[in-house]
C-alpha cells in the first residue's frame, strides 16, 4: 500500500511540474506594482503635531501651494495659551486631516494600559466632535511607543500611528502602527541654537533626500514631519518651508495626500483579488486603484475587474 501511495505521489509531482511549464501558468511570474492615486509614481505626506497658533500660517501656506496636510492635535490643550481654539478647528483644517496626538501629550510608555486607552479614546472622541469627521490616525507624543502601547491602541479605531524615528528612505512601512516617517522638517537643522555649521549640514542633507525623492524612478513615498511652532519667530525657517513647498507642489508625478487617505489607498491595493495567472484583477474597494505591469499603467476602477491581455 505504501508503495502504491509513493507511486501516486511521484506521478502527481511530475504532473505538477509539467503544469508549471505551461505558458498559462508561467505568466504567474508577472510583477504587479502599486502606483499612487491617479497613477502617480510618488506620494507626499506632510505631518505636523500639537495644534499651536503657528498651524494657522502653515495651513495657509499649504493651501496656497495646493498641498495636503495631516495635523495631530492634543484636544485638552486646545483653548489654552499658545494653542488653537476649539471653535476654529473645523474651518481651519478643512481639506486636511485631523488626527490623534493624545488628549494631554504624555509619554505613553510611562502609562498603564488603561491610561493609554483613555488618552487615545478621549482625544479621538473630542476631535471627532470638533471636526464632524471620523478620526482614524495618530502620532505618538514624543514618538514614544513600545509593544504595550501598540497593543493598547489596537482595537481603538486607530489605523496608523506615526513615530519620530526618521527612516531616511521612501518605503511604505510594513507596520502601520509603527509608521516611521522619512525625515524631520529640515533634518535636524536648528536643533542646536546658534550653530550655523550644523544647520547648513542638516539642511543640505534634507534637500538631498528631497532631490533623491524627486529623481526616483521607482514608486516612492516621502513623509516629512515636524511642528509649525519650530518655524515661529525665525523668518528664514518659514522661507525654507516655502522653498520646499515650491519644489514639490508643481510636480505632476507627485500625489500630495493626507496620511489616512494614503493608508486607505494602500489597503485597497493590498486587498485586490488576483487570479492565479495574474491576468484577472478585481478591485472590491470603493476607490480606484492604479497598478503597473511591465512598465504599463492600468486603472482598476472601484468595484470593477481588469482583464490583462498578454501574449
Write out the residue ranges for each language-model feature.
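Bacterial Sec-dependent N-terminal signal peptides
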Residues: 1-21
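Boundary/entry segment of secreted carbohydrate-active catalytic domains
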Residues: 21-56
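C-terminal domain-boundary segment and adjacent tail
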Residues: 24-36, 64, 79, 128, ...
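Extracytoplasmic/secreted proteins, especially bacterial periplasmic and envelope-associated proteins
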Residues: 43, 57, 115-118, 122, ...
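Active-site metal-binding loops of divalent metal-dependent hydrolases
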Residues: 48-51, 102, 228, 259
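Metal-dependent polysaccharide deacetylase catalytic core of the NodB/CE4 family, i.e.
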Residues: 63-159, 164-193, 220-228
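Alpha-helix N-cap and loop-to-helix initiation/capping positions
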Residues: 111-118, 198-201, 236, 240
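A Trp-anchored, charged/polar loop motif used as the substrate-binding/catalytic surface
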Residues: 195-215
